[in-house]
Amino acid sequence: TWEECCKNPGCRNNHVDRCRGQV
């Protein structure tokens, strides 16, 4: 899930815009 991805520094760094869009 995006939530799990955003919790992962490496994954989040690759999807910063997506993670910032997820509240």
Curated annotation (Swiss-Prot):
Tagged with keyword Cell cycle: no
Family: Belongs to the conotoxin A superfamily.
Disulfide bonds: 5-11, 6-19
Main location: secreted
Protein name in UniProt: Alpha-conotoxin-like RgIB
Expression tissues: Expressed by venom duct.
GO molecular function, one term: toxin activity
Protein location: Secreted
Sequence segments annotated as region (Lacks the Ser-Xaa-Pro motif that is crucial for potent interaction with nAChR): 7-9
Claim: Secreted is one of the keywords in the record: yes
Record GO cellular component, one term: extracellular region
Function: Alpha-conotoxins act on postsynaptic membranes, they bind to the nicotinic acetylcholine receptors (nAChR) and thus inhibit them. Is a specific blocker of the alpha-3-beta-4/CHRNA3-CHRNB4 image nAChR and may also block alpha-3-beta-4-alpha-5 (CHRNA3-CHRNB4-CHRNA5) channels. Has possibly a distinct nAChR binding mode from other alpha-conotoxins, due to a different three residue motif (lacks the Ser-Xaa-Pro motif). In vivo, causes hyperactivity and behavioral disorders in mice following intracranial injection.
Domain topic, free-text comment: The cysteine framework is I (CC-C-C). Alpha4/7 pattern.
Phylogenetic placement of the source organism: Eukaryota, Metazoa, Spiralia, Lophotrochozoa, Mollusca
Keyword terms: Acetylcholine receptor inhibiting toxin, Disulfide bond, Ion channel impairing toxin, Neurotoxin, Postsynaptic neurotoxin, Secreted, Toxin
Domain of life where this protein originates: Eukaryota
